[in-house]
């Protein structure tokens, strides 16, 4: 199985990404499945050089995940009479390497155990009672250190730390009911981190809201995170569809830490988000680092809150070639005020003005087993002051264009 995407921005940011996975079934003769997934993405700034040298500005992410799935619940043990619907147990080990150009290199690795239940054809439950991740900041640059010396929240989010978490996810999908022309898909997920460890400390006499408690000599994260997403596919006619999507998320850190881990925070933009803007190029809120080094500001374009809305009209052109026009909107925000990122906190009175907006068009070559997609995003509105009056405030038309080549539909 292979997924591929390539993104190009008019500001010379170019980046491919790919996911390659291999699966071996019936590993032990009892229906077990062993899987390996390798993913990677790379982005470089084609029109800029570092400090006058020939080195290109580049960032990359690499990830390796191995899974072993048993087609039953291993613990506790249920009889077939107690559980007469599909269920499975999955053990997972993973490692993710994140390199941010000129700033830092972060390694996150860990493992988890989860249960999957499907009591009906349309409902799916996923329970992860145990997940432990360790974030290791491997390398920082002088430029990064100079930023974190004044931006304590960013420094805290990237510190070496454990993330002991548990998760529950519910998914509803009525697409298996083939008699319906219109399809609904929605998912809700909640993650809690650090509560059990904090409870153990509380039993030992430590105050619940006291910070800097540790696990094996390193701090551990404590937060609650929730996301919800809904998609609706409405059939207009022969191979014509109006597809809508809404997504919202929030993460709140408390107790042992007031800043959530960097890789748990929200970001926006890219081939499956607001296609006129590249990943981590907007937000939080109206925040904008107005300096010569703004192209590197993606390191702190993360937030505690996220809202995103997409509307796409899909239509046939010729044979397996289809077209699409779309409208994308959204942003991320901070829950707490951060003086290092002015304008980043959510203010309900300016919510609509804070939403970035983009439109565009695309082509899809649908071969049933694979969809090859090319989208052109066109920026209409940026949430921060660009110096241009009016709702359409893109300084130059070409600055608000994004080009995306990908495998699969965006949603």
Range-by-range predicted roles:
Residues 2-14, 19, 23, 126-315, ...:
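C-terminal outer-membrane beta-barrel translocator/porin domains of Gram-negative envelope proteins
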Residues 13, 29-31, 237-239, 318-320, ...:
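A cross-taxa feature marking solvent-exposed loop/turn segments within ectodomains of secreted
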Residues 110, 129, 270, 356-362:
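Glycine-centered small-residue hotspots that permit tight backbone geometry or close packing
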Residues 328-330, 335, 360, 364, ...:
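Flexible, small/polar- and glycine-enriched "cap/hinge" segments at structural transition points
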């Amino acid at each position: 199985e292979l997924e591929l995407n390539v993104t190009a921005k008019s500001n010379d940011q170019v980046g491919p990404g790919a996911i390659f996975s291999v699966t071996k079934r019936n590993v032990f003769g009892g229906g077990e499945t062993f899987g390996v997934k390798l993913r990677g993405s790379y982005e470089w700034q084609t029109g800029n050089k570092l400090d006058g040298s020939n080195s290109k500005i580049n960032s990359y992410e690499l990830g390796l995940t191995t899974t072993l799935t048993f087609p039953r619940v291993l613990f506790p043990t249920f009889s077939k009479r107690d559980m007469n619907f599909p269920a499975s147990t999955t053990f997972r080990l993973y490692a993710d390497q994140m390199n941010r150009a000129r700033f830092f290199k972060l390694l996150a690795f860990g493992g988890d155990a989860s249960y999957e239940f499907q009591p009906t054809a349309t409902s799916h439950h996923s329970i992860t009672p145990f997940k432990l991740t360790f974030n290791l900041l491997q390398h920082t640059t002088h430029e990064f250190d100079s930023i974190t010396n004044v931006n304590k929240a960013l420094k805290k989010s990237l510190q070496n730390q454990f993330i002991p978490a548990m998760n529950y996810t519910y998914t509803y999908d009525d697409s298996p009911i083939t008699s319906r022309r219109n399809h609904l898909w929605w998912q809700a997920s909640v993650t809690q981190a650090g509560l059990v460890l904090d409870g153990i400390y509380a039993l030992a006499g430590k105050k619940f809201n006291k910070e800097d408690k540790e696990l094996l000599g390193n701090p551990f994260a404590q937060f609650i995170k929730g996301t919800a997403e809904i998609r609706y596919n409405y059939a207009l006619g022969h191979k014509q569809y109006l597809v809508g999507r809404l997504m919202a998320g929030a993460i709140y850190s408390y107790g042992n830490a007031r800043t959530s881990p960097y890789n748990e925070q929200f970001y926006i933009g890219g081939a499956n988000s607001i296609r006129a803007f590249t990943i981590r190029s907007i937000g939080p809120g109206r925040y904008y680092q107005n300096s010569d080094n703004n192209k590197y500001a993606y390191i702190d374009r993360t937030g505690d809150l996220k809202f995103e809305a997409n509307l796409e009209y899909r239509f046939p052109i010729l044979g397996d070639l289809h077209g699409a026009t779309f409208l994308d909107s959204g942003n991320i925000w901070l829950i707490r005020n951060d003086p290092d990122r002015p304008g980043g906190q959510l203010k309900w009175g300016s919510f609509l003005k804070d939403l970035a907006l983009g439109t565009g068009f695309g082509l899809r070559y649908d071969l049933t087993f694979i969809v090859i997609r090319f989208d052109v995003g066109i920026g209409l509105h940026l949430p921060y002051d660009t110096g241009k009056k009016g709702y359409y405030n893109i300084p130059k038309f070409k600055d608000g264009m994004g080009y995306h080549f990908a495998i699969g539909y965006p949603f």
